[in-house]
Curated annotation (Swiss-Prot):
Residues 1-64 are annotated as: Domain I. It is found in: Cytoplasm. NCBIfam families: ruvA (TIGR00084). Homotetramer. Forms an RuvA(8)-RuvB(12)-Holliday junction (HJ) complex. HJ DNA is sandwiched between 2 RuvA tetramers; dsDNA enters through RuvA and exits via RuvB. An RuvB hexamer assembles on each DNA strand where it exits the tetramer. Each RuvB hexamer is contacted by two RuvA subunits (via domain III) on 2 adjacent RuvB subunits; this complex drives branch migration. In the full resolvosome a probable DNA-RuvA(4)-RuvB(12)-RuvC(2) complex forms which resolves the HJ. Residues 144-148 are annotated as: Flexible linker. GO terms for molecular function: ATP binding; four-way junction DNA binding; four-way junction helicase activity. Residues 65-143 are annotated as: Domain II. Its main location: cytoplasm. GO terms for cellular component: cytoplasm; Holliday junction helicase complex; Holliday junction resolvase complex. Residues 149-199 are annotated as: Domain III. This is Holliday junction branch migration complex subunit RuvA. It comes from Geotalea daltonii (strain DSM 22248 / JCM 15807 / FRC-32) (Geobacter daltonii).
């Protein structure tokens, strides 16, 4: 079972990376929080890995911290929460903020996450509140870009948000409302779009 990978960042996108480990490329799915923390392509990185084995595939999920990985494992231990949704949850809320919401029983906050309705939010609090406490997780404390860069960035952000469960038409409208400044990055646009979508 793979628990940690260290290698060269061969490819970086909002929902997955390819990590070159001694000439072997590993496709690793990641939450946005990990994406934001990654250096530029070609850099050496280490990620905590969760290996999900299915009958027809082996999927790797990577996290910048053990806290994120532990939270992911807690999430997928809940009935109805698979790895894809667990990853999506951590893309919408930082692990420490999620811990805080679970401990406080903040159903309203949890229910704003795509794929999490009221019943699922209640189940998360019921099943994970005490487990999170034991882990000790606490709360956290424009110019126009060139057309090609604008379109590429916009497409990346729209694709990433649609993969998280947001409707494409809503995402496109939100991203267009934000606009793309000359110094904008995919990370900054994702943060702005998520902030608007989660209101």
């Amino acid at each position: 079972m793979i628990a940690l990978l260290t290698g060269k960042l061969a490819h970086k996108s909002p929902d997955f990376i390819i990590l070159d480990v001694n000439g072997v490329g590993y496709r690793v799915q990641i939450p946005f929080s990990t994406y934001y923390a990654l250096p530029e392509g070609g850099s050496s990185v280490s990620l905590n890995i969760f290996t999900h084995v299915k009958e027809d595939a082996i999927n790797l999920y990577g996290f910048r911290t053990m806290e994120e990985k532990e939270m992911f494992q807690l999430l997928i231990s809940v009935s109805g929460i698979g790895p894809k949704l667990g990853n999506g949850i951590l893309s919408n809320i930082e692990a420490q903020n999620l811990s805080d919401a679970l401990i406080r029983g903040d159903l309203a906050r949890l229910a704003t996450i795509p794929g999490i309705g009221k019943k699922t939010a209640e189940r998360l609090v019921l099943e994970l509140r005490e487990k999170v406490k034991k882990l000790g997780h606490g709360p956290l404390q424009q110019d126009v870009a060139p057309a090609d860069a604008h379109n590429d960035m916009r497409d990346d952000v729209v694709s990433a948000l649609v993969n998280l469960g947001y409707k494409e038409a809503v995402v496109q409208k939100t991203v267009d409302e934000i606009g793309v400044a000359a110094d904008a990055t995919v990370e900054s646009l994702l943060k702005q779009a998520l902030k608007k979508l989660m209101k």
